[in-house]
Amino acid sequence: MKKDGSSGSFGIKASPGSLSRAVSWINFSSLSRQTKRLFRSDGELSVCGHQVEADDENWIYRTQPRKAVSNLDEESRWTVHYTAPWHQQENVFLPATRPPCVEDLHRQAKLNLKSVLRECDKLRQDGCRSSQYYSQGPTFAAGSSPCDDYQDEDTEADRKCSLSSSEEERFIGIRRPKTPTSGDFSDLHTQTNWTKSLPLPTPEEKTRQQAQTVQADVVPINITASATGQDDDGSAHSLYVPDHYSTLGRLDSYRSTGQCLETRDTSCQTEDVKVIPPSMRRIRAHKGVGVAAQMSHLSGSSGNMSVLSDSAGVVFPSRLSNDTGFHSLPRTGPRASTYSLEGRMGALGSTEDTDDTSPYQGGSLQGHENFAHLGGASSTGMLSRPKSQQLRFLESPACVVSPHAAYSTSVIPNATLLSSSEVIVIHTAQSAGQLDSRTPGSSSYSKIKPRDRPTPRCSVKDDHQSPRHHWNEGHLIHSRALASSVPGATTLLSLHDSEVSLNAPANRENGSQAILYHCRNNPSFPDHPSDVDGKSECSYSGDRGCGSSEPWEYKTSSNGRASPLKPHLATPGCSTPTSNVSSCSLDQTSLKGDTRSLCSEDHDGYYTTTHEAGNLYTLSDGLGNPRHSMVNVFDGRAQRSQGDQAAHQDKILSRNISLKKAKKPPLPPSRTDSLRRIPKKNNQTNGQVLNESLIASLQHSLQLSLPGKGGSSPSQSPCSDFEEPWLPRSRSQSIVSEGSSLTSTTTPNVYSLCGVTPSQSDTSSVKSEYTDPWGYYIDYTSLQEDPGNPTGGCSANTEAATGNGPVRHIQEGSRVPVPQVPGCSVRPKIASPEKSQRVTSPSSGYSSQSNTPTALTPVPVFLKSMSPANGKGKAKPKVPERKSSLISSMSISSSSTSLSSNTSTEGSGTMKKLDTTLASALAPPPPPLPPLPSPCLADKSPFLPPPPPLADCSEGSPLPPSPMFPPPPPEALVPFCSPTDGCLSPSPTAVSPSLPRSLPPVPAPPPFLPSSEPPPAPPLDPKLMKENRPFFKNSSQSESSREALRRPANKEEGCRPPMPLITTEALQMVQLRPVRKNSGAGAVLFSEPSAQEQRTPTAPQYHLKPSAFLKSRNSINEMESESQAASVTSSLPMPAKSQSQGDHDSAVERGGLPSCSDGAPGPGPSLRTTLLPDSSPSRKPPPISKKPKLFLVVPPPQRDFTAEPTENGSEAFPGVPSPTRAEGEAVRSQEEKSSPASRAGSHATAPTPGSPALEPGTAGSLSSSIVEANVPMVQPNTSPGPTQEESGENSVDGERNAKSCLSQQGREAGLLEPNTAASSSDPVDVSKEEGSDEVLTPTKPRTTEDLFAAIHRSKRKVLGRKDSEDDHTRNHSPSPPVTPTSAAPNLASPKQVGSIQRSIKKSTTSSDNFKALLLKKGSRSDTSARMSAAEMLKSTDPRFQRSRSEPSADSPDSPSSCSPNKNRRAQEEWAKNEGLMPRSLSFSGPRYSRSRTPPSAASSRYSMRNRIQSSPMTVISEGEGEPAEPADNKARRALDATRVCSLDRLTGQEMDQASLLCSEEPASVDGIGRAEGNGPSEQCGGTEQKS
């Protein structure tokens, strides 16, 4: 019937529809009247429908005998007034005297005007119509039909102001019911005219319609089955959606455009137009499949595709079947289809299945079969939705949930539904009953039910028809069984609701598990083309086409989510997530992936999606609780299936989140999408088998909070793999568009991720809080590690990048283990760092910044993070990253850091390699670092994918995870560090293979030193650990904790995963206790132990150390510095100097300011010696390489410092200042000299020579270089050969960091103040002495100073400390110690100058808060002014700028300017050299990290401050001298004139970096605020969070 109506009436209407739309402005009145007529009398409509159609088609501007009221009539009056000859002539235009042609023209003009007016009025919806002003009735020449009476009627009505407004409303009201009623659907076909004719409903109208439509739609849901005929049309239409991958906006368009869009989406406007007639029906479609579904479809091109595309597909079939209920079907159906679900399940499943399926079957049912087979994703092109709906109503529970979830959470469910098609099929087995049962419980489930129903119907049919869809079949059977045993289904549904897959798993596990499992296995088994197809990333669409190709009408569609997302539709979740999920999840089980997407919503409270996912899980895993029940999820393959499902769920959740988010911020998802696409490409399906055991092991370990190296490690790889897809999933889901983009890229990964995801899902305990992210991440973590070993790298990165903060943690955490495991090798596969980065961005619960900041890498999804877990508001919001200071934050923080690390590190060129490296080894660390504020979370994340272990984060519990986590901390520590560290720490052993692989992607070995570093890295790591231990011993305060961390780290040192142990602890300690609790040195030391432990294991620990360090304010700078250092490290990892310094820096950062400094020297020399020879390229120091200069410069002194209590950084500093000054200068000179060598060779050779020289002066230099190390880290990161710059910039940045650290410590403990003061003079002298040596220093310090000033203020404000004291301590004490510490006068000079100037200005300035910043800026400017002409030239010289000046020029640039500049340049250079952007990562990382854990206390304040600082920093970067310091300004201007060129080039980068630093530093400064809420600071959050 619908087909007939649609085909007949609609076929006619297709033309009129477009015509009427084209002519709508002119024809609007007639359309309106027709619409009114349609609404007024359905009978008349039925009679007139075709006539109206004819009218529309034959739209003629008929002269309407009605009084032709035109201006000419009035003109005639005027003519009377003006009786001029021409006026008299005008009489010709009078109606009586006009020639017929003129009359026609007038009439047409009137009509057009009136039509336009009417249309405008309709749009106005205020009841007052412009047309009413014209008392002429609607001059719709459109009424050339028997409806002319109606035209007159309408005219009269139009004349009545109330009629147009009230009747229009009435129309709307009537229209809604008509739309929903299937009887009306006949009318709708008739009404298709009015739908065509009707203008899109105004928002109000839409809202009204939707409101009215919902109930009416409930009934039509049944008709979903009827949509078979339309389904075929839908197939064509469905194809349309695939084109809209980034249809998030389109999603909105769908929603806003609603009818029109849907029509277009259907591709077969005929059908869609038909649907369009009931504007509300369109809206209904939005509702049922509805906005969420459509969004999902649009964004995911999955659900929405289903809905929109599926207008032809599932939704459309449903709707078409239900003529009226097509749109309303998804809406009302899912909501009100509880009865429908069951009835439909039975009726549609059986009867309707046959009926609908028969038409559907012809073109769509087979597709549905494929759907079922392909998880409904395969044939989801357009069948996906139908399948979704048909299958779904077998799987109604999931489907229903999904639509609602899709609606509620996002369209994702629908998108998921596409995935859900398969998922639903899986669910159908268990979901049919479940959904039915659940449907009553939650309208949202009901909602999907209708769609589910059609899908299940199809599925049932398919199952019956095609054993080929064994899972579909089995699951269909299950569905039937479930339907039969609705009680159990209800329980399942209930559980599914809360834990979609918990109960369902039991149910499903029993009967359908094998099938679902089989399905899940299908990915493994070629048997399931869908799975197999899904497995193939892109193939999946094609494969899906293959799988569903037989039935798939849009086999064409199937070819690509590209063309029609129909296949994607089939894997709608894969589209965004659906394309990913489809590819991955759907790959696993087309169904599963989509289900995952679907299930994702589950967490959102739209357990519907989760339910689907859960059902999928259950089906695939037989694990009822994919999300919450980690253990179940870990069912080897089942787990992987579940993992996929979980990934899908998570993704869907994310996607739902993002879909929700997508409505408004779909764009970031788009970006994510782009990023994801890149990463998704890794088809991380391998390791499915491994996934089983590894996941099981991981699951156990995660659940037990044990290190579970075996499980953990596997978990990480899969986690990585999964994370990426997961992230995309989440993100993807959140960003349907992204999903569509990701579809191709993420698909394979998603598949892997999907497999892993369940693991995370299972880890639902943790996931409870971050249900979405954690569960999935954890799940997929364990799951994906093994299967995703190849994808692990990518996945790990993805995990790191995974939008869900928790997810990211888990991913990172999981990822960390991956490096330990062979997965490391696989990781390179995952090595698409972009993935990680991309994921990171989305993954970071902080999706916006993630996405936005990801200048380096399309931070894709951290919409997902934000959206993945983030976008979802539910899971992500659940994981308040900002609130997740500790545990919660841990996961989010980890995610954030990971995101930021991944994003920053992987940001660009580096991103890939870094991502690989990080994914392999470092990926895990980044999350911990970002979550530094929440080390537990971070720790738990990798080790304990399950969120609960996350809570475990205590030193003991996290330690096990920590081993995995240290790598994340490295990455988190700073993107710059993480690349190297990640590679080195986890990578050296496990990631070694991966790193090499990564390294190839990142050609420049220095950037990562992965290939060469990985093997040496372990030695380095142990050495670092051992060295760090002495270092830690120096910090007796943290000694025990350090030892604790160290021991686990050492224990796992060989494994590298132990690093995460430390990382977690370090993160926890640093973030929670040390940063906030420890006053200064205590906090620093505490952080240091954690970080050091982290570092002890290796760079990861080092990173963690920096995390701890970041805990101190220095940490933030270090983060930034480190991120740059990562780049530099990549460039200069080889240089012993760089390495040693890097290590030292790491130690310094680890120990806070002085503590780290002390600790670093011990490991520094050893590291230099050992690392240089042993793993010059690939030793942990490579990340340290970021701070290599410092390290090299500082190692011996650092040891000295180690001997001296680091806490008393000033002690060390005071003692060191003279050596620092003398040796610092020498060091700086050497470093500068060595810098070119480092630059040129980027090897330890050049740096090594410099290193010995540097070492002597480094003692003092490093003391202050603790911070310096941080800055140098940034600077080394900046350039392949930032050695010189490192020494100078390290000094500057280190000084800045040291200041930061010292002032932070001083602020916190006041310990460093005296010491700082004591060293202040020396540092000042050194700074002055070395200012000429390191002209770079002045500029850099200024920016650094500026940042610090801002940070100081922020922290002071947050902490309520006095500005003057803080400023003094920080500016003076920290700066001087830093200066002496940074034997390189570079740091001392810029910083000291800044310090001195600040001191002077301080005395002068009454308002320290405000003026301190200005003064700091001034000092920075002063520093830059002090830059020697040679240095200025260097900085200005483009050659120096990019190559040597990257470190060198940056150094001249103000610290902040330099750092960001350096970071940027480093990113650029790294991108050029390595293809990764450590700086970018670092850049992004700090931002994300910061945002991740935005200072709750002053979130707004921080964001404002950050922004303000960003602005000043930028200005400083540009001008190098802000108006703040007149004197300094002059010098700065002089310097700037020379440096302008370089700055201009670097300004953008610097601005970003500066803003990063600003954001980062304030957060760092606010040890408490930072950990508590770094939201605004998330830009720098990555860095700061570590702090």
UniProtKB/Swiss-Prot annotation:
Entry annotated with the keyword Phosphoprotein: yes
Modification Phosphoserine occurs at: S24, S197, S328, S563, S629, S1079, S1157, S1218, S1373, S1375
Bias kind Basic and acidic residues: ranges: 449-470, 1040-1055, 1222-1234, 1360-1370, 1434-1447
Keywords recorded for this protein, A-Z: Phosphoprotein
Comp. bias regions, Low complexity: 705-720, 885-911, 1448-1460, 1484-1503
PTM-bearing positions, type Phosphothreonine: T1379
InterPro entries per the UniProt record, alphabetical: NHS-like (IPR024845)
Compositional bias ranges of the Polar residues kind: 179-196, 431-446, 573-584, 730-750, 757-767, 792-801, 838-855, 1089-1099, 1112-1141, 1275-1285, 1392-1409, 1576-1587
Chain ranges passing through the membrane: none
Ranges annotated as biased composition (Pro residues): 923-934, 958-972, 998-1021
Residue ranges, annotated region (Disordered): 140-163, 176-202, 431-470, 549-584, 661-687, 705-767, 789-1059, 1083-1534, 1565-1587
Family: Belongs to the NHS family.
The protein's name in its UniProt record: NHS-like protein 1
Species lineage: Eukaryota, Metazoa, Chordata, Craniata, Vertebrata
